[in-house]
A protein has these predicted regions:
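Gram-negative outer-membrane beta-barrel transporters
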Residues: 110, 279-292, 307-407, 471-473
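C-terminal beta-signal and adjacent terminal beta-strands/loops
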Residues: 37, 43, 50, 198, ...
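Signature of Gram-negative outer-membrane beta-barrel scaffolds
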Residues: 27-186, 203, 215, 222-226, ...
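Repeated loop/turn-to-beta-strand initiation elements of outer-membrane beta-barrel proteins
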Residues: 23-26, 111-116, 187-190, 277-282, ...
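Transmembrane beta-barrel strands of outer-membrane/channel proteins
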Residues: 28-34, 118-124, 192-196, 271, ...
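Short, small-residue-biased leader/transition segments that mark boundaries at the very start
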Residues: 3-6
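Residue-level signature of outer-membrane beta-barrel architecture
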Residues: 16-19, 102-108, 172, 180-184, ...
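Membrane-embedded beta-barrel scaffold of Gram-negative outer-membrane proteins
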Residues: 189-191, 212-309, 315-317, 338
Length: 474
């Protein structure tokens, strides 16, 4: 499959602000945008795909029908005549959004240095999807009975699945913000904030390959029933309804393709510090995030594309700390660390093919590193202005992340890993030359992992890299 997207956007924002250096600082505004987005996303089934995914799936169902009661049910099979099948896909998904917002900050409230910020944003979002997807398939159908001996071929049947229509959704959000900050010196403060976050919903256009396959199966069965004698058609339809519960039901495009907005309440407490006459700058923070209707990206069951789903709710909490030290004119060092504990509070994953309930509640949210860290140092040599070389800087850094879970099941993960990087930078009046190396220890780790069609695929890290950057200023 291949997607081709074209997009146009028009936006406008009008803002009114108070003058600076006032005890009451405020900002009020209105904003809006309209985005046109057209996606052409056809899916092409080549010969193996036709055999395995279209012909194979429905023949497996026919085989199961026969094996459940081989003495009373006939053997049924079909043979797709097309070597290739193309499923078209054309989707227009425009989005309109407008917002009205206000934020006020009251400085030196009650005591000098204490400020309170309160804000509110009212947002309206309207989205729609015009969709068109069709296909065409030619096939033969075979029915074989043991008693009485009977072998009937239905040849040159045709099915033409078609999905065409429009979906519309709109959402209203009220997003408040409240923050307290205390400046106990011009360069040092501590703060507490509470905000409500929002992430837009949308449409899973790649799900249409699933929908069109379901409609294709229905149309193929309808073609068989139209060709079969009336007495035999009733028998075939009864067996199919018994083993294919969704047969005859209207496809629910809205339920299958729409994913809802994600909401979160975010709580943070922290401090910004400048110590030892500015030689040491420190940022400290602790946070808690309560997320509902969490959006999780996953592959569709057939493996033909990815979709976004609302998994349920999750909670995340952690700490972050960063330190930047200017030891002297030549040497500076930095260290940062973050810890995040992010788990699902509720995750209804639906049911398996054997109708078993899937529940990932309590599991770690995938793609969220438990630990992140960075440490680095730079030492610079400065030369006389008359020298052709102005400075030479030597830098080293170490970056790490992990443990990272790749699946909602938490059965595949990447343990903590770190990479060592270095850089030598030569600066002249007009020329800068950087010689750099990344992953100097040639560390092997996984940067991305996903599962589709019952197989796992991983993207490995880049090996040791060396390079030179040259910049000329004129």
């Amino acid at each position: 499959s291949s997607d081709v997207c074209s997009s146009d956007l028009i936006s406008e924002e009008i803002t009114f602000k108070s003058k600076n250096n006032k005890r009451w600082q405020w900002v009020t505004g209105v904003s809006g945008f309209y985005q046109w987005l057209h996606t052409t996303g056809p899916v092409n089934f080549m010969e193996d795909g036709v055999t395995d995914m279209i012909e194979g799936n429905i023949n497996n169902t026919f085989k199961k029908i026969h094996l459940d009661d081989p003495r009373r049910t006939p053997e049924m099979s079909l043979d797709v005549l097309n070597n290739r099948i193309r499923v078209s896909g054309s989707f227009d998904t425009p989005v309109f959004s407008t917002a009205l917002y206000h934020q006020s900050t009251f400085n030196d409230l009650f005591v000098k240095g204490l400020s309170v910020t309160a804000g509110l944003r009212l947002e309206y979002e309207k989205m729609s999807m015009n969709y068109f997807s069709d296909s065409n398939i030619d096939f033969d159908f075979f029915l074989k009975m043991a008693m009485p001996p009977l072998n009937i071929p239905f040849r040159n049947l045709n099915a033409a699945p078609l999905l065409e229509g429009k979906e519309k959704n709109d959402y209203v959000q009220l997003l408040p913000k409240l923050a307290f900050k205390y400046d106990f010196s011009p360069a040092n403060n501590m703060y507490v904030s509470i905000t409500r976050g929002y992430r837009s919903g949308g449409y899973n256009v790649q799900m249409f390959s699933e929908l069109i396959q379901s409609d294709m199966q229905q149309k193929m069965i309808e073609a068989i029933l139209d060709k079969a004698p009336e007495s035999m058609a009733g028998m075939i339809e009864g067996m199919i309804k018994q083993h294919m519960p969704n047969y005859g039901k209207e496809l629910n495009v809205q339920e299958t393709t729409v994913y809802k907005p994600e909401y979160s309440w975010n709580y943070e407490v922290g401090s910004h510090l400048s110590l030892f006459n500015g030689k040491l700058k420190t940022d400290l923070a602790a946070f808690y995030m309560d997320t509902h209707d969490q959006q999780i990206a996953k592959f569709v069951n057939s493996g033909l594309g990815r979709m976004m789903v609302n998994a349920g709710s999750s909670e995340s909490y952690g700490v972050e700390a960063s330190f930047l030290a200017s030891i002297n004119k030549n040497l500076n060092m930095n260290v940062s660390y973050g810890y995040t504990h992010s788990t699902f509070k509720k995750y209804d994953g639906g049911t398996t093919s054997s109708e078993e309930q899937i529940d990932y509640s309590g599991n770690y949210v995938p793609f969220v590193p438990r630990h992140t860290m960075n440490a680095g140092a730079n030492y610079s040599f400065f030369f006389d202005k008359s020298n052709w070389m102005q400075s030479l800087t030597l830098g080293m850094s170490y970056t790490g992340a992990g443990k990272i879970y790749w699946t909602e099941k938490n059965n595949v993960s990447q343990s903590f890993y770190g990479t060592l990087n270095g850089r030598i930078s030569l600066q002249t009046k007009a020329l800068q030359i950087d010689v750099w190396g990344r992953n100097l220890t040639n560390k092997d780790y996984t940067t991305f992992y996903f599962e589709t069609m019952h197989r796992g695929f991983e993207q490995k890290s880049r090996p040791l890299q060396l390079g030179v950057d040259i910049r000329y200023h004129f």
